[in-house]
Amino acid sequence: MQTQSTVEVRGKSLKVKVAVTNEGDESAYNVQIYVNENHRIKTSHVKRYLDIKESFEYESHYDLVQEKQGRYPLIIGVDYTDANEYPFTATAVTYYSFGSDTVPKIFGSAGDVKLTGYAKFPLKLRNMDEVTKEVHIYMITPKELSVQEKVREITLQPQSELTTIFDVNNLSALPGSRYQVFFILEYEDESKHYSSVIPCFINLDVLNSFFKKYKWYFIGGPSTLFIVFIVFQFLLQNSKQSKQGPLN
């Protein structure tokens, strides 16, 4: 599911337009778009059926209540199912500027992670400023994944680096799938608000998942064949002795 969004700010009014397109190889069902602005969530109506290459659009409006000018994050998601009612989620994160834009001095990096049932997801942060920063971190994932302590606060000393680790669990994500996840970093000074978004991917390990499910077939199969071979040799030896008869 491909998501595109545009944002427009006029004074204290925010308009968000979202368009989702079914780029998969089968139809999607029960499609619903949601927009999360500062924990205020608005949702579209449910579109029962979205054909391949078909698009679905939704527009939402917010009255902004921010006191400080700057850059703020905006979370966009799409819930849908396949023909068998199996649920899926697609997420995206963008931002809007209220008043004047800001350039953050906190930078982060995270690599892609392989996940079977559980994985640790390291996030490396760097403070380029000469002032200590109190940083709020949010990890945004699809609903198929769960995160322990997905919201946290850390203190970054001036011109320093720090690595924090998030624990991610697989709730219902399918083996072989690839999910985009995001880290949102936010902090403020006396007059401005700053935010940055770090995108990365979680890859569901299909080989490990397959082996885990069928490992006893791989382990037990050779053992069973070995036992059958021994029994066959024993019966063959007895058959030869019976044909030869007793020794004189």
Regions found by a protein language model. Name each.
Residues 1-5, 43-47, 107-110, 149-152:
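Surface-exposed, proline-enriched loop/turn segments that connect beta strands in immunoglobulin-like
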Residues 6-12, 112-117:
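Short, solvent-exposed loop/linker segments at the N-terminal edge
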Residues 8, 48-56, 154-163:
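Short proline/glycine- and polar residue-rich coil/turn motifs
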Residues 18, 76-78, 183:
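Hydrophobic/tyrosine-rich beta-strand signature of extracellular beta-sandwich/beta-rich modules
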Residues 21-41, 126-145:
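Short acidic, flexible loop segments centered on an aromatic residue
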Residues 214-235:
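Selective detector of the "anchor" transmembrane alpha-helix that sits immediately C-terminal
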Residues 240-248:
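Cytoplasmic C-terminal tails of single-pass
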